Amino acid sequence: MAAGSHGGYRGYEVAREREHDVGVSRRSKEHYHHRHPSRHRDSERRRDGGRSGGRELSNGYSHRRDSPRPPPRRRPSEGRTEDREPGEVSGGSGSERSGERPMKTGEPRENGVTRVSKEEAKMSPSKKRKQSPVIWDRNGSKRQARDPVRGIREVDAVVAEIIMHQSHSLPVMSSLSSIGDGHSPMILDVSVDKVQEYEKNRIVDEEEEGYPTMRNILTSRWADAGDEEENVFVPKKKKSVSPVDSIERGSTKKVTSPESGEVLVYNSVRSSSRSSDSGVLQGSANRDLEVEKGDNIDVEEAADDDYPAGHLLDSDFEGEDCRSETPECTRSPRRCINMLQGCRSVDEFERLNTINEGTYGVVFRVRDKRTGEIVALKKVKMEKEREGFPLTSLREMNILLSFHHPSIVEVKEVVVGSNDRDIFMVMEYMEHDLKGVMETMKQPYSQSEVKCLMLQLLEGVKYLHDNWVLHRDLKTSNLLLNNRGELKICDFGLSRQYGSPLKPYTQLVVTLWYRAPELLLGAKDYSTAIDMWSLGCIMGELLSKGPLFNGKSEIDQLDKIFRTLGTPDENIWPGYSKLPGATVKFGKQTHNRLRDKFRAVSFTGGPMLSEAGFDLLNRLLTYDPEKRISAEDALNHEWFRELPLPRSKDFMPTFPALNEQDRRFKKHMKSPDPLEEQRMKEQGNNGDRGLFG
C-alpha cells in the first residue's frame, strides 16, 4: 500500500479470510480463519476511498465518521478477481467495478502492510458480486451503500490518501488511544497544512450535499386537519470533525434512508432534544416517537421510558451549531380551557334571578360584571358528598369543556365561591326549556317546526355518538331553547364515555318516560341505541304535546310500551328471552297501535304524521337495539326532504321568558328522576321496587 512508502504509518492488523472457491462452505471459512489468525493482514485501507463516511465497527464498538472524504487516486488494474465479502481487499476508487483477489502468505509486506500487485487488482465481470443497495444522490451519480461492518481502518485510509497525494510532508507524531483491545497508538506522517486544507475542502463538500430537514409533529399524520399553515423546515447542521478525532467518537447506529417527515439526528452520541415551544420529542434516528394529538401524555415520562437518564436534554448536541430548533407554527383556534390560570370568583357576577332548581343543582341568571354578558350560573350540589367532588358534576364538566357544537350547550368556565364547597359552572344563557315551552303552548308544534327541532337534536346526538359519549338522560326538560329558534342539549350529569367492546353499565339511567325497553328489562350492555329510543319519545311528544309513554313505575312503563307497540318475542327481538326482566308476564298484544295515535289525516284535531314521518318514528321506537336507526341515518331520512320542509330557525315561534315567581308557582307534570329513584330504593321508601328488587 502507498502508506508503506512514507514510513511511520502502520495500520491495524485485522485477520480476514478469503474465499478461494465459490463452493467453499461458510463453516470451512470460519475453521480456516480460526487456524490462521495471523494471515492476510489488512491491506485494503484504500477500499471505498470515494464514499461518504458511515458507521464503522472495531472490536465491538461502532464509530461514525460524520463527513465524506476526498476520492482516492484511481489505479489501472488487470487480471481476474473473485467475489468480495464485507471487509475484503478492494482496489481502485471503491466503486462496484473494482476489487482485489485474496492475498497469499508469501507476498511481501512493508511496515506490516501487505501490498497488492496490479495484476491481482481487477475482478472478472462474471464473478463480480452485485453490491446492494445502491443510493442515488442528487446529481444522479450512483453511490454504493455503506458497509456497516467496516472497522476503523477506513479512518486510517483517509490519512493514507492524504500522504499519498503529497510529495513532501512534515512528520507528525499523533499518539492516539487504542480503539479496543489489541491496538497500539498510531504514528501518522501527516502535513498539518494538508490536514487543514483537507478539512476545509470537506466542509465545502458537506454544504453541497442534500441534508434531510427537520420536521415537527404539526406536519405529521396526527396533526389537526385545520392546521394547514405552511410549516417552516430548519435544516440540521453537521459538525465537522477531523479524521483523527473521528476515531475517538462514540458509537451510533446507521441511519437508513429517511421517509417523508422523519426526524433524523446526526450526532455522535445517543441523545434527544425536547422543544420547549411545541412539547414534541425529537429523538435519534433509530427512534420513532409519535404523539397522538388529543391524548394526555406526559412528555417527560414518555421520554424517560425510552431514553436513559441524562439523555433527555434541551438541545443536547455538540456545540451551538448542532442544535436543532422546532419552529413555532400558528395553530387554528380550538376549544381549550387553561386551568393553570386559576378560577374566577363568583363575586364577579351579578345575580339577577333563579332559573331552575333540580336534582343536580340550582341554576341562576347572572350578568358578568367584566363583559356585561348575561349567562347562566349552575351551582353544584355538594352537601350530600362526603368523599369529594360529585362524580356527576365532574363528568359533566369534563364533557362540556371538551365539546363545542351548535346543538350542545356551551360551558364557558368554572368559578368558585367563598369556600371550596361553592362550585359554579358558567354556561350560555338559554331562555326556555322545551318542556316548559310545550306546556305554555295552546297547540302542538306543526310538522315543519318539529322537523326543525328534530334536525338540531339529531345533529347534537350524532356529535356525541361520534365522540363516544352516551347522554343517557335525553328528555324535553334537558333541551334548551332561545328566542332565535336554536335548540341545545344540556345536563350531562348521567353521560358516560363508552368504547368497544362495550362495558356493563347500570340500567338505572334515563328518566322513566324516555327509558328504552332493554334498560327496563335489566340489560347492562347497551350502547347508543338507548339515546335513539329517547329521541323517538321526544319526537312523539313534540307532535302530540304530551308524553308518549307516561308510566309510573318500571312495570307500568313496560306495560304502556307493550300495549302501544305490541308484545315482543324472539322473532321481533332476538335475545329478548335472555334479559333478566323477560320472565315477567305481560298481556299479549300482537298489533302495533302506534299509528292510531298519529294519523296521516286527522278529522278530530289529533296529531298528524305522514307515512315517511311515521316510518322514522317507528324506526326510532324499534325493540331490537341492533335494528334501531342511528342518528346519522335519521338525519338522511326522506321525511326531512318532503313537504312541508323544515322551518327556518328565524321563523320559529318565540315566547317570553318566565320570571322567578312564574316558575315557582308553575306545576310541572314531572316524570320520576333516575337519581331520585335510586335514593328512594336505597332508603327503602319506594313501595313499588320494580323488576329487580
From Swiss-Prot:
Pfam families: Pkinase (PF00069). Induction: By cytokinin. Residues 26-39 have a biased composition (Basic residues). The keyword Transcription regulation does not apply. SUPFAM superfamilies: Protein kinase-like (PK-like). Residues 1-148, 236-330, 660-693 are annotated as: Disordered. It catalyses: L-seryl-[protein] + ATP = O-phospho-L-seryl-[protein] + ADP + H(+); L-threonyl-[protein] + ATP = O-phospho-L-threonyl-[protein] + ADP + H(+); [DNA-directed RNA polymerase] + ATP = phospho-[DNA-directed RNA polymerase] + ADP + H(+). Residues 268-284 have a biased composition (Low complexity). The modification Phosphothreonine is found at T359, T506. GO terms for cellular component: nucleus. The active site is at D473. Residues 349-640 form the Protein kinase domain. The keyword GTP-binding does not apply. The modification Phosphotyrosine is found at Y360. Belongs to the protein kinase superfamily. CMGC Ser/Thr protein kinase family. CDC2/CDKX subfamily. PANTHER family: CELL DIVISION PROTEIN KINASE, CYCLIN-DEPENDENT KINASE G-1. This is Cyclin-dependent kinase G-1. It comes from Oryza sativa subsp. japonica. The lineage of its organism: Eukaryota, Viridiplantae, Streptophyta, Embryophyta, Tracheophyta. The gene is CDKG-1.
